[in-house]
Amino acid sequence: MSEQVNNKVLITGANGFIGGALMRYYQNQGKDVIGVDLVGNGKDIIEGDISQPDTISSLLQGSDVVIHTAALVSNAMQDSDMWRVNVLATRNLIEAAKKHKVRRFVQISSIVAYGNSAEGELNESQPVLADGGSYVLTKLASEHVVLQAQANDAIEVVIVRPGDAYGPGSRPWVIVPLELIPKYQFMLPAKGEGFFRPIFIDDLIRGIYLAASHPDAAGEIFNLSCEDCRLRLP
């Protein structure tokens, strides 16, 4: 079945690594796309806080698809802030999207939904596990918020669980390692015994694009990552 034509696409967290790459991809495809982030650029990225109802309402007018990448990712943040941004703002956004007759809502979650201790190959049928910090807990809670919102068939939802996205400009998996490795300060996942589930940013963006556009993707959860691997010191 062919892809549906997305009219106006709204991307939250448009200045982020994933959000920015999505903006460029849609623009290169000639699509009508607009972004929102705490810092705008005066052009295609609007300055706004998605936790504020006025911001949400104005952005959603005429939008056909919302791709929600905005989130706090550091466990160093206060739990209350993580909950406000990752869960409450998601709830407000998708409820507003329903009111504005948005057709599809794509929630960018994370492979950590299966828990930090998950080993081996993962598939979407496996149970989730809240064994991490606030990031894991709020990502799982935001998934529940999104899944509940589709209960009345008022909006199509898709959840994407990316692995560790890397590529040019990636701070956690490119910039920071290149800074720390010469200093012998780079720590491997679980001291070299943990699983690393990488995905190149271009592959991830194509996957998200299909999640947002393919008719059969509605109501589904997708893991997007490459083959599992362990990173060990030689």
Residue ranges of model-derived segments:
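Conserved Rossmann-fold NAD(P)-dependent oxidoreductase catalytic core, especially the SDR/UDP-sugar
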Residues: N92-S134
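Catalytic helix-loop patch of NAD(P)-dependent Rossmann-fold dehydrogenases
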Residues: E119-A165, F186-P189
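NAD(P)-dependent short-chain dehydrogenase/reductase
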Residues: Q150-F196, I201-D202, L210
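Mid/C-terminal beta-alpha module of Rossmann-like enzyme folds, strongest
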Residues: L210, H214-P234
